C-alpha cells in the first residue's frame, strides 16, 4: 500500500477515531488503527469491540492495500508534522514508512487481516436528524448516566423512536433526564440503550451544522454522516419504566432564568455537603429560595 494524504485532513480523521481505542487492551491489535484504501479515499477505523468508528479521508492512491498502526503513537507523530503532504508506504514485514516535509519515520505495523470486522450490521431504517439538535439532546441527558457498573442497563442513554418523535432518557437511580424532539418524517417504533462511551463520542463529533442519520437494530446502534461512521453494541438489559416516576401533574411550578438559577446554585453549593452537594429549594409566591448546609462548614442562602 502506498498513499498520499493531506496532513491536516489525516490528523482530523485520526483524532475522531483515536478516542475509541482503550489505553489498556487484552488484544494488541485493538490498540491499533486500521488504515485501508477504498477508491480515492483512505479509511481509518478503530474499535474496542463494543464501539467502532470509521472516517474516510481523501487520498491519492498509488497502491491499494491495508495495514494497522499504533493509534497512540501515530497520533503523536502526526500532531508534530508540518501542514504538508503526508506519504505512507507499507514495506516488507509490515513496516510502514512515513514522510512529511523534511521528517521521515518507520513504524512497525500489524497485519490488517487480524483486525476485527467493523460493519453496520443489519441497519436499514435510517432516521435523519440535525447534528446540533442531537448534540444538544445528548448534552441534556448524559450527566444522568450511571457510572455504577453493577447497574449495567443504566450505563447508557435509552434512544426511543416512535412515529414522529425521538426521545432520549438517562437515569442513575437518583436523577432522571428526558428530552424529546420532533422528527421531520414518521419512523418505525424502535429503541435501544446506547453505551456511555458511544454517546460521548457522538457528542464530540456532531453539531457542526450537518445532518446525521441514525439506525437501531436488534443489537447495534449506527450513526453516519458524510465520511464518518460510528457503530456501538447496544447494552443488553431492561431500562427502568421511567414513565412511572415522571410526575403526571405539577402542583407547584416556577419559571426562572436559567442563567440566574445556575449562578445561584454555584453560590450556595460552595457550602453544601461534599459527597452529594444537596441544595434545598423553597418555593413561595414570587420567590425561590436556595439553601445549602454543611455541619462542618456553615450555611448559605440565596
Set out the residue ranges of the language-model regions.
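Structural preference for solvent-exposed beta-strand-turn elements
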Residues: 1-299
